A protein has these predicted regions:
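Small-residue-rich hydrophobic transmembrane alpha-helices
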Residues: 59-119, 158-177, 270, 281-347, ...
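Short alpha-helical transmembrane segments in multi-pass integral membrane proteins
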Residues: 1-30, 87-154, 196-253, 309-375, ...
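Residue-level hotspots within the lipid-embedded alpha helices of multi-pass solute transporters
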Residues: 37-38, 74, 114, 118, ...
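Short runs within selected transmembrane alpha-helices of multi-pass transporters and secretion channels
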Residues: 80, 150-169, 177-188, 206-221, ...
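Transmembrane helical elements of multi-pass membrane transporters/channels
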Residues: 28-47, 150, 184, 213-217, ...
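N-terminal transmembrane alpha-helices
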Residues: 17-49, 53-54, 70-82, 86, ...
Length: 458
């Protein structure tokens, strides 16, 4: 599939050119990201399995809120992406003072956004769930409101952690965020087990350990950022710098708009599924958990893509930009082929881990089969390649493509197949594959055209 990107560009570096990244440096960057993503998805699966012991109303309420939670998380991630791109570009241009300044601005913006969004979600939890999902069963609604109000308290700390982790990725040291993520997830999963099985707390037992783990993670990452021997010197006194903030937000806002609308679209299609009852909601939640395993390598490599391409763009080296984009995409195809192949091979055993009824289990198996089979082919070009364009400041194009593809293909066909034709969750997942096909076409053509080369200005 990576041959689609070739166009008129060379597929390797000139012999005399000094590469910006060695094979070892790429692995040092990518492997910890892979482990971090694995931890995140594994803990998410553990949360779902544990709360499933509290009944299908509880798992449905938590899964519906997790869609809103993902919407919030992508806002923080988009802001972190904007900061990571700017820092990487300054490092590529060997402009250390501005790299330090942009690092401080990222942390400041992350903290402010976390406080504002957390307060809004806490106060408006019930109206938000009603807005997104309309009329749902009362016990599902009550579980969702309780979960969202508690988890909203963690948003400021999650935003700070994401910002700090992005800074370490931008300098090629993803090991730090991996270590802190490991501790955060251990706290979370142990806390869940104690609260759910020991204290019989229900959805509270999933939410409170998440809050505690994120507080610890934020404290640790900030301590690392302000160490005297840190590669980046983050200013101890943070004041808003209009010019630098504008540069970060110039990448972060389009990415946030794109990703938040993408997640909002996912929430809308889940709201279509929710009209078919608890069986479809629960099967969709379990399928999302398992499919998260399949895309772990792709997500890790897409994060590495931001650092690598951002550094190449800052150095003004388009040849290396193309070379490393293709290299990382090849890695994504190989690793995602292995991960999704393993899921398909052991699918029934994996779904059997969850406490599901027979009907729910069979539907979950069907949904995972659709996703895993198609992700091997379409996912890397749909979601890894766009990060190369973002790192080159071509954020408006990726935003427009993602929004239009979501609106026209995923939402449109979800309504047609799920609601009008009565396919339920299966119709939504078929529409997802149609959306991926559109994204692949647009992003490949854009990369081949070379239009992204004109977007970065030092």
């Amino acid at each position: 599939m990576t041959k689609l990107l070739h166009g008129n560009e060379k597929s390797s570096l000139n012999g005399g050119r000094e590469p910006l990244f060695s094979q070892k440096e790429l692995l040092v960057l990518a492997v910890p990201l892979l482990v971090e993503q694995l931890l995140e998805v594994t803990v998410g699966m553990a949360d779902t399995m544990m709360v499933s012991r509290c009944g299908e109303a509880a798992i449905s309420g938590v899964s519906l809120v997790d869609m809103i939670n993902n919407l919030i998380i992508v806002l923080f991630a988009a802001l972190a992406t904007g900061g990571a791109v700017v820092v990487s570009q300054y490092l590529g241009a060997k402009d250390r003072p501005d790299a330090d300044k942009s690092a401080g601005q990222l942390l400041l913006l992350s903290g402010l956004s976390g406080v504002v969004i957390g307060a809004v979600c806490f106060v408006l939890a019930r109206p938000m769930i009603r807005l997104f999902y309309g009329s749902i069963e009362p016990d599902v609604l009550d579980a969702g409101v309780k979960y969202l109000q508690i988890i909203a308290l963690s948003y400021p700390f999650l935003a700070l952690y994401n910002g700090g982790a992005a800074l370490f990725r931008s300098i090629g040291n993803s090991k730090i965020s991996m270590q802190i993520s490991f501790l955060m997830n251990i706290i979370n999963i142990v806390g869940n087990a104690v609260c759910i099985f020991g204290f019989k707390m229900g959805v509270d037992g999933v939410a409170w350990p998440s809050v505690g783990s994120r507080v610890v993670a934020a404290a640790l990452i900030l301590r690392k950022c302000y160490r005297e021997d840190a590669v980046l010197t983050v200013p101890k006194t943070l004041r808003l710098d209009g010019g630098m903030a504008k540069r970060i937000l110039g990448i972060g806002i389009p990415s946030a708009f794109e990703n938040s609308l993408f997640e909002a679209g996912r929430i809308l299609v889940v709201s279509m599924i929710s009209t078919f009852g608890t069986v479809q909601i629960a099967a969709n939640a379990v399928a999302n958990n398992l499919d998260g395993m399949g895309v772990i390598p792709g997500k890790a490599i897409s994060l590495a893509m931001i650092t690598v391409v951002g550094r190449c763009i800052g150095a003004g080296d388009h040849e290396q930009t193309v070379y490393y984009t293709r290299k990382l995409l090849l890695w994504a195809y190989i690793t995602m082929g292995l991960s999704n192949g393993a899921i398909l091979l052991f699918l029934r055993q994996l779904v059997g881990i969850y406490a599901l009824s027979g009907e729910t289990m069979e539907l979950a198996i069907t949904l995972v089969t659709i996703h895993a089979g198609c992700a091997i082919i379409f996912w890397p070009l749909s979601f890894v390649l766009p990060n190369a364009l973002r790192a080159a400041n071509d954020v408006k194009f990726t935003m427009v493509v993602s929004i239009l593809s979501m609106a026209c293909w995923r939402l449109g066909f979800s309504y047609l197949l799920c609601v009008r034709m009565g396919w339920g969750a299966v119709g939504v997942w078929v529409a997802m594959v149609i959306d991926w096909t559109c994204r692949v076409t647009c992003f490949v053509l854009r990369f081949r055209s070379g239009a992204w080369k004109t977007k970065y200005q030092a």
